[in-house]
Amino acid sequence: MVTIRLARHGAKKRPFYQIVVADSRNSVTGRFIEKVGFFNPTAQGQEEGLRLDLDRVNHWVGQGASLSDRVAKLVKDAQKAA
């Protein structure tokens, strides 16, 4: 099953997440199909906190991909902002 989920990157105590489309059987930070955005929960000032390609997310959801709980909230926020 294909899932759109967060893959953690960054340093210790400085999380940075890539939003990726991946097979649910692969590890969280392992192999993925496509990057569709990023999420920076510690963004300050002019730093961009969320970038999401909504066209690609909608494409993958149309193909049957499921969203993780956190990604579903981020997509909802991105649609509200757009």
Curated annotation (Swiss-Prot):
Molecular function GO terms recorded: structural constituent of ribosome
GO CC, alphabetical: cytoplasm; small ribosomal subunit
Keyword Nucleotide-binding: no
GO biological process: translation
Keyword Nucleotide-binding on entry: no
UniProt cross-references to InterPro entries, sorted A to Z: Ribosomal_bS16, Ribosomal_bS16_CS, Ribosomal_bS16_dom_sf
Keywords: Ribonucleoprotein, Ribosomal protein
Transmembrane segments: none
Gene3D superfamilies named in the record: 3.30.1320.10
Entry's family note: Belongs to the bacterial ribosomal protein bS16 family.
PANTHER family per the UniProt record, alphabetical: 30S RIBOSOMAL PROTEIN S16 (PTHR12919), SMALL RIBOSOMAL SUBUNIT PROTEIN BS16M (PTHR12919:SF20)
NCBIfam families found in the cross-reference section: S16
Name listed for the protein in its UniProt record: Small ribosomal subunit protein bS16
Organism of provenance: Vibrio atlanticus (strain LGP32) (Vibrio splendidus (strain Mel32))
